[in-house]
Amino acid sequence: MSIIVGIRCFGPSKATARLEGSKTYSKDFMKRHNIPTAEYGNFYDYESARQYLDSVSHQVVIKADGLAGGKGVIIPATKEEAHQALREMMVDHQFGAAGNEVVIEECLEGDELSVLTFSDGYTIRSLPPAQDHKRIFDGDQGSNTGGMGCYAPTPIGTKEVLEEIDRTIVQPSIDGMRRDGKLSLHSSLVTLN
């Protein structure tokens, strides 16, 4: 807890915030701590990323590593669109330095759910689950935006789903952050159809 200008507040340290601010770092964190995540590759150079993209047969999501105003995640419909998105991020620097590194991951189908969790390093407490509306058009169509809104609680966040999230994602994340000396968590999850 910090007191700045007389306002009591709390939040993640800069080191902990890296889990939200760097997609490559958070994917490696999940892998290191055996937390379920989509199949992925992290890339620092365009040619390696391009070759990886050519080698996969599944639909992908391409993510700029850094913060890009909520617009750095591209879900291409075709391999050509994927190559275009990769080129725009890494060669044309569409998102500036945020796209110097990218994650190319398997596209998972399902409903997305956000869970904001607080912890002292052992106990976990979560706010009601929320569902974001990131796309620019109705019906979850169009490109992602910086945020079109959300609502909570969401009906997809059933008691059973939340218990599974706590058991397989939240608690292992807290345990991993404690082992790494970092604590705070915001989870954006996809429940598979």
Located regions from the model:
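A short, GP-enriched loop/loop-strand-helix hinge that lies immediately N-terminal to
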Residues: M1-G21, I35-N42
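Catalytic-core regions of core metabolic enzymes
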Residues: S2-V5, A15-T16, S48-A49, E81, ...
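Acidic/polar active-site rim loop that often engages polyanionic ligands
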Residues: I7-F10, D28-P36, A64-K71, S143-T158
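Structural detector of well-ordered beta-strand residues that form the stable sheet scaffold
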Residues: F10-G11, A38, V61, V103-E105
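Short, charged, surface-exposed secondary-structure boundary motifs
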Residues: R18-T24, F137-D138
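Short, glycine-/small-residue-rich phosphate/pyrophosphate-handling segment
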Residues: G21-Y52
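Conserved anion/nucleotide-ligand pocket segment
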Residues: S57-K79
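Internal nucleotide-binding/catalytic subdomain
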Residues: G72-N193
